[in-house]
Amino acid sequence: MTTEPAQRYEIRFQPAARRAIAQRLPEAVAAAVLEFCDAALAVKPHQVGKPLFGPLAGCNGALRGTYRIVYRIDEKSRVVHVLDIDHRSEIYHRPRQ
């Protein structure tokens, strides 16, 4: 009996997430985030994160060390929109678009 591999989600980085990777995150954290997004997040976004509440309601979040990756899942088009990445103590204090 063979099982079909899970269909991957497309990962799209929004401007704030791209800026975080290029400018704010330490190099090792940025590399870990990119690897996580390309592997686990693209395959099982519901399992690797959790739903967020408050100002981030409707989004999911996953931790890489002390950094939170905030993302939204579009099931219809199988796209994960990575909205922002920052230290978990800072991510909740920035305004969202």
Language-model segments: which ranges?
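Surface-exposed, Lys/Arg-rich phosphate-binding patches that contact polyanionic backbones
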Residues: 16-28
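Enriched for short, Lys/Arg-rich terminal
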Residues: 1-12, 31, 67, 72-97
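Residue-level recognition of oxygen-bearing side chains
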Residues: 16, 57, 90
